[in-house]
């Protein structure tokens, strides 16, 4: 019923009739949108064949109705619009799923736009109607044509031929419509009511399309200049320009409007034009043509598409009947110079250039002053031996079609002189021409693309040092490889003064001496290593040129060693860039330099806490500004870690407790992280169990309880491996800044914050949850309960279990001498409050924040800081 009722719409000459026509076409398009590619292609072919068969009568009708152009050339245009458009798109998919990646879970689907409003110019009425209706049929769009009043009969005739053939081939009735009695009001209405406008015409019409509130594919005025270089083939250039300019009496918008000839060939170019039947105007004739061409600054419509003899008569003089083109010589590029404007007829302006750069200047000035930006530019040059000129031309001209060695009217529309250039009768001019498209308009511009995106989890990895040696007394055995396996010659040791003076490096140097490996030691690492410290070490490194770097100590020594390693291998490394925050370490903007090309890196911990021996992290401080640069990249992962309990037996109680709780925090945050995996979970759980069991013994009897020391060393390294891959959370973000602003030891800072952060993270209804594909919903409470259960802590329910778990952590902290609050560590209240807002913002921006299961608001971080300070 809908299809038969739609055909009752009669002549479209009022807004009411157009409203009915719009409804008719929309109804037909809704049906057409369900067609398969096979059905569409059948219709597309049938319509193209019908249009091609009617190419001659349509050409005659267009010339008779408009009084412009040449029948024989319009036959070619009609043929082109049917044949070349069909050939270009006959095998192009425009329906349904066109791309699917099952591995990535993406699918892309072509969908029609809906109703297209097509504004048709008087210069190319039938060919443009054929072109636009065909590409709409290919894309399952409905179309309503608004013809130019001077060309309405021929335009509608072309549209009706395509429509009848399409319906006969199976298209829904009403899929193509037109305005029978065109007016500005009806044109504006269809532009407003359509889904997209295909606008071809003058600047005013294009501006109206873009101002309609409807998405528009508009084109602009052409004003192509053809530069003839001194190296050009003059005969080819001149005759191609004549061929182009006389085609349909110059009415294709890409046609040459001016010629710019180099002074060395100017006279030869002029002679060739004359030889081939062109007429050079004298000064008096040129002035008459100027006055005829432009009326009140606008192109005189009466000259468009006319023969030279006709135009000359309008101007009041005569030229030979067989004159091909009228040529006016000019020097000014100002808007007042009529020969510098678009003419759409058989008139050319001609300029003389001093050299190639001057030719570019003239061409550019004509575009800027007289219109045509974005449309077309033409070059004739020896493109083999003068390639640089072609490149300069391409760089300078602000046009979307840069036509080389080609008649631009036929070359600009595509596919005739270069088969990789899409055929079209709607030529986009890009932003330079005020357009939304910068290429020849085709079927892709009339399609919406739906993208179906299924959730996919990231590819994950587990990264660790190539070799990890552990057990008491493993150091000399591990170092054997430097000689027996790797053949190393020189080793550079990085440590701090305390460890050096207390003989911690002696076991290393003795072994190196035994193997005949030369060595030097840098022992000036400060607790918070600075860039100055690292540079001092690097100077020594460069002088010594080692092939091995051995960092021994706590986190500071290992961090300093990593930084020196970076500067040694990459002196131009920029810490600001390397410290840049990222969401995904694999997608960071900055690519970390490849490490290990100069030196093999070994990390040996002397405390059980940081895990730095197995992590890709380091922190360096700029001593001039106080800025800390946290670096994170797997290139910073040590090549070898040696975890020898002999190096940890004499660690003082304060270091033992602080580093032990630091390791516990590593395990807890790695387990709660949005990036936690089965590979990291096992390490984190085992580390927690070992810490709860052995930290008190290591704290009480550190120098004699070998078992406790060894298990704490294992726990620290396992927790390090866990957070090296799962990353950390806001406890570490806040602890980093608490330490930076108030100089609390890192382990202590973590200890003061961890249970508060656990309560914060465990909220089943957080304001915001962390963002990572693997993390599907807030479940941190359950995760903490899993940790508790692994320790044998079980409550009545999850909330009770969490409370008991937190009580156990607080008891462990108290057992190893950790105080309750930030205030208890002597941090001045006023100073704390004065720095609080800065701490909060810096903590929010810390690299660790992104992996937290609850994405924090700054106000929430502030509240936790205050609670940690006051203990309530």
List PLM regions with ranges.
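Carboxylate- and glycine-rich phosphate/diphosphate-binding segment that chelates Mg2+/Mn2+
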Residues: 267, 275, 614-726
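ALDH superfamily catalytic-core signature
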Residues: 5, 12-14, 206-334, 361
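Gly/Pro-rich interdomain helix-loop hinge
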Residues: 741-833, 871
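N-terminal Rossmann-like NAD(P)+-binding subdomain of aldehyde/semialdehyde dehydrogenases
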Residues: 2-107, 135, 275
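Glycine/threonine-rich beta-strand-loop-alpha-helix active-site module
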Residues: 87, 93, 158, 532-646
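ATP/NTP phosphate-donor binding region
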Residues: 459-548, 822-823
């Amino acid at each position: 019923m809908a299809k038969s009722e739609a055909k009752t719409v009669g002549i479209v000459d009022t807004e009411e009739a157009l409203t009915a026509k719009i409804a008719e076409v929309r109804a037909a398009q809704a049906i057409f949108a369900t067609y398969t590619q096979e059905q569409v292609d059948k219709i597309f072919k049938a319509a193209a064949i019908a249009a091609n068969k009617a190419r001659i009568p349509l050409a005659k009708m267009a010339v008779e109705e408009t009084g412009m152009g040449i029948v024989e050339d319009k036959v070619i245009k009609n043929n082109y619009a049917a044949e070349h458009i069909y050939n270009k798109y006959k095998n192009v998919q425009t329906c349904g799923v066109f791309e699917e990646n099952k591995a990535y879970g993406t699918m892309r689907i072509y969908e029609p736009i809906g109703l297209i409003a097509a504004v048709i110019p008087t210069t190319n009425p039938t060919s443009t109607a054929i072109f636009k209706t065909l590409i709409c049929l290919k894309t399952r769009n409905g179309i309503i044509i608004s013809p130019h009043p001077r060309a309405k009969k021929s335009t509608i005739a072309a549209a009706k031929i395509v429509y009848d053939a399409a319906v006969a081939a199976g298209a829904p009735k009403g899929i193509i419509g037109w305005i029978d009695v065109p007016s500005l009001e009806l044109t504006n209405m269809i532009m407003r009511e359509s889904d997209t406008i295909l606008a071809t015409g003058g600047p005013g019409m294009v501006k109206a399309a873009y101002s309609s509130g409807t998405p528009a594919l508009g084109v602009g005025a052409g004003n192509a200049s053809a530069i003839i270089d001194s190296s050009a083939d003059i005969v080819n250039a001149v005759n191609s320009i004549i061929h182009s300019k006389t085609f349909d009496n110059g009415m294709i918008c890409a046609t040459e409007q001016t010629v710019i000839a180099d002074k060395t060939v100017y006279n030869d170019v002029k002679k060739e034009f004359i030889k081939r039947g062109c007429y050079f105007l004298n000064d008096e004739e040129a002035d008459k043509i100027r006055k005829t061409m432009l009326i009140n600054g606008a192109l005189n419509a009466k000259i468009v598409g006319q023969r030279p003899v006709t135009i000359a008569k309008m101007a009041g003089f005569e030229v030979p009947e067989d004159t091909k083109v009228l040529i006016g010589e000019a020097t000014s590029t100002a808007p007042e110079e009529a020969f510098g404007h678009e003419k759409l007829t058989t008139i050319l302006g001609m300029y003389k250039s001093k050299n190639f750069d001057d030719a570019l200047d003239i061409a550019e000035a004509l575009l800027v002053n007289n219109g045509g930006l974005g449309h077309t530019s033409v070059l004739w040059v020896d493109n083999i031996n003068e390639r640089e000129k072609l490149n300069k031309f391409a760089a300078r001209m602000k046009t979307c079609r840069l036509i080389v060695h080609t008649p631009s009217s036929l070359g600009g529309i595509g596919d005739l002189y270069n088969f990789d250039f899409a055929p079209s009768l709607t030529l986009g001019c890009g932003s330079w021409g005020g357009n939304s498209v910068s290429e020849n308009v085709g079927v892709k511009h009339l399609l919406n693309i739906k993208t179906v995106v299924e959730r996919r989890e990231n590819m994950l990895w587990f990264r660790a040092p190539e070799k990890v040696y552990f057990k008491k007394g493993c150091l000399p055995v591990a170092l054997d490889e430097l000689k027996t396996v790797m053949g190393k010659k020189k080793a550079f040791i990085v440590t701090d003064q305390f460890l050096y003076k207390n003989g911690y490096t002696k076991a290393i140097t003795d072994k190196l001496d035994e193997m005949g490996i030369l060595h030097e030691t840098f022992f000036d690492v400060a607790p918070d290593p600075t860039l100055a410290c690292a540079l001092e070490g690097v100077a020594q490194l460069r002088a010594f040129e080692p092939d091995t770097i051995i960092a021994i100590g706590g986190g500071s020594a290992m961090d300093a060693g990593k930084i020196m390693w970076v500067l040694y291998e990459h002196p131009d490394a920029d810490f600001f860039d390397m410290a840049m925050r990222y969401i995904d370490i694999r997608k960071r903007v900055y690519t970390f330099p490849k490490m290990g090309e100069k030196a093999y890196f070994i990390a040996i911990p002397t405390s059980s806490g940081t895990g730095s021996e197995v992590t890709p992290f380091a922190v360096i401080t700029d001593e001039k500004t106080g800025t800390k640069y946290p670096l994170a990249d797997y290139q910073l992962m040590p090549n070898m870690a040696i975890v020898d309990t002999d190096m940890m037996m004499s660690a003082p109680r304060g270091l033992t407790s602080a580093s032990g709780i630091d390791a516990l925090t590593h395990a807890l945050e790695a387990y709660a992280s949005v990036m936690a995996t089965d590979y990291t979970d096992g390490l984190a759980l085992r580390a927690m169990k070992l810490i709860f069991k052995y930290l008190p013994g290591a704290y009480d009897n550190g120098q004699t309880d070998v078992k406790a020391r060894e298990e704490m060393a294992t726990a620290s390294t396992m927790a390090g491996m866990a957070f090296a891959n799962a990353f950390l959370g806001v406890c570490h973000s806040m602890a980093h800044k608490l330490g930076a602003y108030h100089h609390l030891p890192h382990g202590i800072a973590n200890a003061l914050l961890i249970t508060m952060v656990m309560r914060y993270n465990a909220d089943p209804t957080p304001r915001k949850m962390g963002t990572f594909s693997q993390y599907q919903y807030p479940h941190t409470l359950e995760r903490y309960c899993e940790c508790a259960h692994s320790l044998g802590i079980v409550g009545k329910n999850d909330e009770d279990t969490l409370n008991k778990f937190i009580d156990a952590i607080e008891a462990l902290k108290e057992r190893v001498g950790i105080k309750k609050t930030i205030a208890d560590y002597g941090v001045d209240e006023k100073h704390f409050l004065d720095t609080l807002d800065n701490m909060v913002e810096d903590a929010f921006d810390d690299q660790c924040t992104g992996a937290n299961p609850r994405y924090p608001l700054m106000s929430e971080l502030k509240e936790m800081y205050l609670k940690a300070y006051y203990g309530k």
